[in-house]
Amino acid sequence: MLNEPVSGSISNYLTTTHHAAVIYGEGVSFYYVEPPEKESLTYLGLLVFVLLNQAWFMGALFLVAGYFTPGSYERRGAGAFLKGRLLRLGVPLIVWVFVLNPLASIGLYLEPVPRIPGSLTWEAYPHLLGLGPLWFVALLLIFDAGYAAWRMLPQQRTPTPPRPPSQPTYASIVLFILGLTLSSYLLRIIVPIGQPVNLMLPFLSFPSLAYFPQYLSFFVVGMVAYRRNWLQTMPGSMGIVGVVAAVVAFVLLFPLAFFGGLGGQFLGGGHWQSAVYALWDSIMAVGLCLGMITLFRRFLNGSGGVGQFLAQHSYMVYLIHSLVLVGLAVALRDIELANMFKFGLIVGIGVPLCFVVAAIIRRVPLVARFV
């Protein structure tokens, strides 16, 4: 079955490396960035890495979250489930928006080419509020609340026992990919990839709602997988097929989506390149998740002392990794190194440092109750 400690620590590694690549490669959408070395192999490599990560790993997080949701609800009941979600998701979210996000945003003033002119003053505080990477926590809280509301409907109040073990069919997987491709393509006509969407308040900005069909559908698939024991019964060959499909899609569809250059047609707006890109990232997401499930089940199903340590601190790592990365990037700012070397340093130092800092913070009284 899916191993929560291992999946949590690996997802944190991917999140941290993803944002480190944004700092030195993409150059636009983080708290601190350095001018990318455009027209270089470093720029191209980090850009491809960011796009590959974006295509699947947040969907994988929602899949894992969905898998563990029904069992948690049935063990605790509606009231305790919602209270637990508000404490574990809502409280850290509030602290992030009003305290930690403004601290991380100081990096905007420390960039080699600052995006915000002038000096940092208290008048800037309202403009530094935001969800940042905690958009995932906010959206997960919405999904959990929606699941609880659905379970409290009269016809859903009786606990649903797990069904006899079954496994998904290749036909159902292909239909799912096609449905995900179509819904993603249609949404991206209105909300292209990279366009933030504000909900009610300016600081409630979701940066990647273009992937909403993937996030919601993977959360639901995770719950279905729990009910039908898919993670125990899915054949290992299905994981291999998934990875092969992802590789083939990367070789054939990924370059095709950029036909005509990097002008942005692949991001959305109804262009045919956007349809190709939606098909590519749907195949990537499904294929790599199938491979991840079978890999974890076969090789990474244990949870020894190291696994328990990673599990205990993985959520705190997710909360603080942006601050750690900004601090390290600022410390390396004036050192004459190529961006790829700085990327390697910040990942090599940043990932273990995040866990050390997380372990220290969680020793503060009451903190471990929430994270």
What positions do the PLM features span?
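Alpha-helical transmembrane segments and their immediate juxtamembrane cytosolic regions
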Residues: M1-V371
